[in-house]
Curated annotation (Swiss-Prot):
Prevents the cell division inhibition by proteins MinC and MinD at internal division sites while permitting inhibition at polar sites. This ensures cell division at the proper site by restricting the formation of a division septum at the midpoint of the long axis of the cell. The gene is minE. GO terms for biological process: cell division; regulation of division septum assembly. It comes from the Bacteria. This is Cell division topological specificity factor. Transmembrane segments: none annotated. Belongs to the MinE family. Keywords: Cell cycle, Cell division.
Amino acid sequence: MSLFDFFKNKGSAATATDRLKLILAKERTLNLPYMEEMRKEIIAVIQKYTKSSDIHFKTLDGNQSVETIEVEIILPK
């Protein structure tokens, strides 16, 4: 993959694939009853120490036994 390929528009098939991955990731988290509570606790701790309200969670692709969640925090200046 070259640098120029990074800026090309994705085709509809690639976009549909990405959307399906998001749906499947969300369905996997629905099976874990503690996941939403854990997210709320993480947000509370982050807000306590950073005073940031701009926090985003993203579920990353993992294998079937491990789920990875990425947290993006936008810190105020």
